[in-house]
Regions:
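Acidic, polar-rich low-complexity tracts and alpha-helical solenoid repeat scaffolds
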Residues: 2-6, 15-150
Length: 150
C-alpha cells in the first residue's frame, strides 16, 4: 500500500511540474527589431559613458533617439540612468565633448540649469519605473545633491 501511495504521489508531482512549464506570454509585447536597435544604442551609450570616452553629449543623443522611437524598451531604466548622469556631468562642465555656448541650439540644449533639471527628471523617472534598480543609490545621491531642499 505504501508503494502504491508513493507511486501515486510521484505521478501527481510530475504532472504538476509539467503543467508549471507551460508557455507564458510576456506582459508586454516587444518588437524584436526595435528591441535589438535599442539594445545596440544602449551598448554604444555605455561605451560613450565610460571613463575612457566621457562622451556625455553622445549618450544623450542615443537616449533621445531611443526614447522617442521605443519608450517601452526593456532596459529603459539603464538608459534613464545614463541620460540622468550624463546631464548631471555636463551641467558641471565635465566630459571630453565640448559644449559650444556660442551656438544657440547648444546653448539652449546644454544650459547648465536645464541639464540639472533633466538629470533630476531622468533619474526620478528611473526610480519611479524601477524602484529596485541597481543604480538607485547613486541616483538618489545625485537627486539629493541637485534638489537639497527636498
Amino acid at each position: 500500500m505504501k508503494v502504491l501511495s508513493f507511486t501515486f504521489l510521484a505521478l501527481v508531482l510530475s504532472v504538476t511540474a509539467v503543467s508549471a512549464q507551460r508557455n507564458v506570454t510576456p506582459a508586454i509585447d516587444r518588437d524584436p527589431l526595435l528591441e535589438a536597435d535599442a539594445l545596440h544604442n544602449l551598448d554604444v551609450a555605455w561605451q560613450a559613458f565610460g571613463p575612457a570616452r566621457k562622451a556625455y553629449k553622445q549618450v544623450l543623443g542615443r537616449f533621445e533617439e531611443t526614447y522617442a522611437a521605443y519608450p517601452e524598451f526593456s532596459k529603459i531604466d539603464e538608459f534613464l540612468y545614463l541620460a540622468g548622469m550624463s546631464s548631471y556631468y555636463l551641467s558641471k562642465n565635465e566630459g571630453k565633448q565640448e559644449v559650444n555656448l556660442k551656438i544657440e541650439r547648444e546653448r539652449e540644449k546644454y544650459d547648465p540649469q536645464r541639464l540639472r533639471e533633466n538629470a533630476v527628471a531622468y533619474l526620478s523617472m528611473m526610480l519611479e519605473r524601477n524602484p529596485e534598480s541597481k543604480y538607485r543609490e547613486n541616483a538618489e545621491k545625485v537627486i539629493k545633491e541637485l534638489k537639497p531642499d527636498e
